[in-house]
Amino acid sequence: MGLAAVGMIFENLRTACRDGGNLQAREKMSLASTFAGLAFTRANVGYVHAIAHQFGGRYHTPHGLANAIVLPHVLRFSANAVTQRLAQLALRARLGDEDEDDEVLAAKFIDAVEQLNRDIGIPTQLDALQEADIPALARAALHEAHTGYPVPRYMTQEQCEELIRRLLPKASAAPSSPAPTRKPAAKKAAAKKLTTKPAATKRSASKA
């Protein structure tokens, strides 16, 4: 069911987002959602949901949006442990050929997920995320994942924090500093000294 869901998502999600009136694409996405739900009800979820739950709890981020933002990062973290399965997903999404190496197909799948996010307007950062919150978010996510989810590769606290930190909003450009108010006065004083020095020299010359 999971494979079928992935195939339908890659075939229909862009169309459904671009053209909400396309009932065929929306019907396929509804079916894909149902299949995916049935699949993870049996196989359970992992770090994507665990981290996304923390974003929802702290920042009220919609769960689907949080999942989409986190997904590519967790896929890259877990890729070496699930290369063959990612390759199967790539084939189902028609992203490559069976004669390609699993590593190549797995990389294509993750790249395609990132491209799909871009195509439908999913942000790459979480605007509400605060640096100070990251340690607590990571601890809560790991507690959730490690007590009930069959994750393919375990994260440490440091690794989870690093992953979440990649989602911090880009720092806004620092505003240009106003010109110091004392500089003109300093320039004026310097100019005054320059004008008085020649006069002093002239007086010295007359005495001689």
Regions found by a protein language model. Give the residues of each.
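Active-site segments that bind and position negatively charged phosphate/pyrophosphate groups
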Residues: 1-112
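C-terminal charged capping/lid subdomain of soluble metabolic enzymes
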Residues: 86, 96-188, 192, 197, ...
